[in-house]
Amino acid sequence: MTSRGNAETPLLRLAGVRHDGLEATALELEPRSMVFISGPSGSGKTRLLRVVADLDAHHGDIWLDGRHRGEFKGHQWRHRVGMLPTESRWWHKDAASHFASLPGTEALKGLHLETAVLKRPIGQLSTGERQRLALLRLLANAPRVLLLDEPTARLDADSTGRVEDRVRAYVEESGAAVIWVSHDENQAKRLATQQFTMNAGRLTATGGRAK
């Protein structure tokens, strides 16, 4: 299965990637591609993202920009291939402490966030605020590949639109690629360059480029 165009070397390539509950998977992403995956709960969607992010051990091979996963140290890979889980994780008392360089006012406003939110205790932030800040934290690493696990599932329509716009702008500016798990068919129609379904660990292509 592929989302390639005319590029000689795909940005991301999977060959025979498998794990418990995940059948051998082949996938290729070209720069600026946005691959959407849907499917029932427990079908292997999140597992695939975790495998690509090198968070779970697996069999098979993965290449990034023509370089094999084995050529990277773990932290190097996870900076270049970044995952945003459904429920963002935080380990400092406030969001600001998670950034080497704080996001600018425009970046915050683009996601409908105020500067003050960076210094508020994490426990006082809404789910939507945490998720939007987690996206900014991920983008601060300038990843080549974004792995997004239902990033807008708990957001309202306005925040969803802002997240979509920010991801789309980042992809266009940087040439990055995205694997986006979503159950929102309309969202996939708006953004996807290719669509897949996951069922019982098997990934199947179902749709082409968004209009």
PLM features: residue spans?
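Helix N-cap at the start of a conserved alpha-helix in ABC-type nucleotide-binding domains
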Residues: 157-159
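H-loop/switch region of ABC-family ATPase nucleotide-binding domains
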Residues: 181-183
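Hydrophobic anchor residue at the start of the ABC signature
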Residues: 135
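Helix-to-loop junction immediately C-terminal to a conserved catalytic motif
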Residues: 52-53
